[in-house]
Amino acid sequence: MSDQKINILAIESSCDDTAAAVLCNGKILSNIVATQKVHEQYGGVVPELASRAHQQNIVPVIHQALAKANIDKKDVSAIAFTRGPGLMGSLLVGTSFAKSLSMGLNIPLIEINHMQAHILAHFIEEDDFEKPTFPFLAMTISGGHTQIVKVTDYFKMEVIGETIDDAVGEAFDKSAKILGLPYPGGPLIDKYAQEGDPKAFKFPKPKVDGLNFSFSGFKTAVLYFVQRETKNDPEFVEKNLKDICASIQYTIIGILIDKLKKAVKETGITQVAIAGGVSANSGIRQALKDAEQKWGWKCFVPKFEYTTDNAAMIGIAGYHKYLKKDFADFSVTAQSRYKF
């Protein structure tokens, strides 16, 4: 098997990024992402517009990925694609295209769970990229998900904690919207937080049993705080923006780290990885570095290009499924809610 070249063409279309990548034996040859700017004016992703943009982008993105990898279609060993979770209209574009390409080239089709792929991005073959060993804990943090996952093998994953309402990415974005920041607001909160005082304002941490999370009450607390303060001073947010952002970020990261500490204590697993769009946040990255020093954890943080939606992570998941000959048939359908 080691001498065989396994070229995986991967397709990702779960939300508003159209992405394609080519991996050879787990190493990235190309990783192309077409980001849809159309949603910014609406303050969030519009599913119908996302689906239409995927239809326009998918062919050129795949052509780019193959060209950059210097791979011909006939050299592709299998097609891996995101089956879910995500927006149904977006998923259907990638699923239909992957099935058609697989059928036309007469090569295997591999269906991938988007959230598993975020975790498996830690196993992309790169010389300077240390990988976790099994078992480890993975915290998936994004606009749609907040989970703590116990990972005992590539596809043996158990969700041991998750949000009971809103995801952490939504807490960042909605807080930003309340502050009058443009979409996507999460990265802007991170940017302003770096120059603010994280203890300037105090926000409540929701009390949730076990390893589960809740962020809906936190968003409400931010809203009421801003409404109350701007009533007294209409320019309050403008004057205190950096401190407010720092305090919001400090509280959210505190919620995440508290639950991770509890998960480490309950499982005895001290290897901890983060995955998903919010893992690009500088505060959570620093908090994990601090955790290594304070509590002796071994922490794994993905490269920035693998935090947001990308096809490289779909490709590495596809590669490990290919090794197991775990292929899908052509009756496979997209699933907007797809638990693992």
From Swiss-Prot:
Q: Which residues bind substrate?
A: T140, I141, S142, G143, G144, D173, G186, D190, N281
Keyword annotations from UniProtKB, A to Z: Acyltransferase, Cytoplasm, Iron, Metal-binding, Transferase, tRNA processing
How many cofactor units bind, and how? Binds 1 Fe(2+) ion per subunit.
What this protein is reported to do is described as: Required for the formation of a threonylcarbamoyl group on adenosine at position 37 (t(6)A37) in tRNAs that read codons beginning with adenine. Is involved in the transfer of the threonylcarbamoyl moiety of threonylcarbamoyl-AMP (TC-AMP) to the N6 group of A37, together with TsaE and TsaB. TsaD likely plays a direct catalytic role in this reaction.
Q: Metal-binding: present as a keyword of the record?
A: yes
Q: Which InterPro entries match?
A: ATPase_NBD (IPR043129), Gcp-like_dom (IPR000905), KAE1/TsaD (IPR017861), Peptidase_M22_CS (IPR017860), TsaD (IPR022450)
> Where is this chain's protein located in or outside the cell?
Cytoplasm
* Membership in a protein family: Belongs to the KAE1 / TsaD family.
Q: What start-end ranges are recorded for coiled-coil regions in this protein?
A: none
Q: Which Gene3D superfamilies match?
A: 3.30.420.40
* Xref: SUPFAM superfamilies: Actin-like ATPase domain (SSF53067)
Which annotated residues bind Fe cation? Answer: H114, H118, D309
Q: Name one GO molecular function term.
A: iron ion binding
One GO BP annotation is:
tRNA threonylcarbamoyladenosine modification
GO cellular component terms given for this protein: cytoplasm
Tell me the cofactors it needs. Fe(2+)
Task: Name the chain's protein.
Answer: tRNA N6-adenosine threonylcarbamoyltransferase
EC number, UniProt record: 2.3.1.234
Q: Which organism is it from?
A: Christiangramia forsetii (strain DSM 17595 / CGMCC 1.15422 / KT0803) (Gramella forsetii)
Q: Which reaction does it catalyse?
A: L-threonylcarbamoyladenylate + adenosine(37) in tRNA = N(6)-L-threonylcarbamoyladenosine(37) in tRNA + AMP + H(+)
